[in-house]
């Protein structure tokens, strides 16, 4: 049974950005975050948590969000930064970068989850925000489509790992490929399965 959450009550603010991340769990590639300010006069139908949408639907909404949003941006932390900072801190930094990169600065930021990075404006964490807040849903779609496409590019370079299929997550196929072929530069050296393969303990 999934727990039902109360409908989200928006804070009194003029320009609200939603922020979400994709890629905290994978063993390879960047953690990608997005920030989106939606236009209330140009609504987008069908926004929800990106994980609940088909790839085809995500791609359609990805283009629609970019076209209709007041502003959208991406922020990221690469594997080297993740290894240096740890994944939670790297995610916070990536979120800060996404917000800072918006062409229009929001006066309030809603962030998926339960942790908030330090930001120059008011912010609020929203549990299950990708389901409850349209701005966060939009950010989750932008971040996921962006990262998935990066994994497809990496897959073309290193087809032996199956990145296009598992998107870098630690599936049995991925871990077996790591054991067989070793790690590539884009693998996160601080993540346990990669550390084990590299003999770093």
UniProtKB/Swiss-Prot annotation:
Enzyme's top EC category: hydrolase
Keyword tags: Cytoplasm, Endonuclease, Hydrolase, Manganese, Metal-binding, Nuclease
Entry-linked Gene3D superfamilies: Ribonuclease H-like superfamily/Ribonuclease H
Domain (RNase H type-2) ranges: 14-201
Pfam families xrefs: RNase_HII (PF01351)
Cell location: Cytoplasm
InterPro entries in the record: RNase_HII, RNase_HII/HIII, RNase_HII/HIII_dom, RNaseH-like_sf, RNaseH_sf
Single Gene Ontology MF annotation: manganese ion binding
A cellular-component GO term for this protein: cytoplasm
Annotated family: Belongs to the RNase HII family.
Function: Endonuclease that specifically degrades the RNA of RNA-DNA hybrids.
Protein's name in the database: Ribonuclease HII
């Amino acid at each position: 049974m999934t727990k039902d959450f109360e409908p989200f009550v928006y804070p009194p603010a003029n320009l609200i950005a939603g922020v979400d991340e994709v890629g905290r769990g994978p063993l390879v590639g960047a953690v990608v975050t997005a920030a989106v300010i939606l236009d209330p006069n140009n609504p987008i139908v069908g926004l929800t948590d990106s994980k609940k949408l088909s790839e085809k639907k995500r791609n359609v909404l990805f283009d629609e969000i970019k076209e209709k949003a007041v502003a959208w941006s991406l922020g990221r932390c690469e594997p080297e930064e993740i290894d240096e900072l740890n994944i939670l801190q790297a995610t916070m930094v990536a979120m800060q970068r996404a917000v800072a990169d918006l062409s229009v600065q929001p006066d309030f930021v809603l962030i998926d989850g339960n942790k908030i990075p330090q930001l120059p404006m008011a912010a609020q964490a929203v549990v299950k925000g990708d389901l409850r807040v349209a701005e966060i849903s939009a950010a989750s779609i932008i971040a996921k489509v962006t990262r998935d496409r990066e994994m497809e590019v990496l897959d073309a370079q290193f087809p032996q790992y199956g990145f296009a299929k598992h998107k870098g997550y630690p599936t049995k196929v991925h871990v077996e490929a790591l054991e067989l072929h070793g790690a590539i530069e884009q693998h996160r050296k601080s993540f346990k399965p990669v550390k084990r393969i590299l003999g770093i303990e």
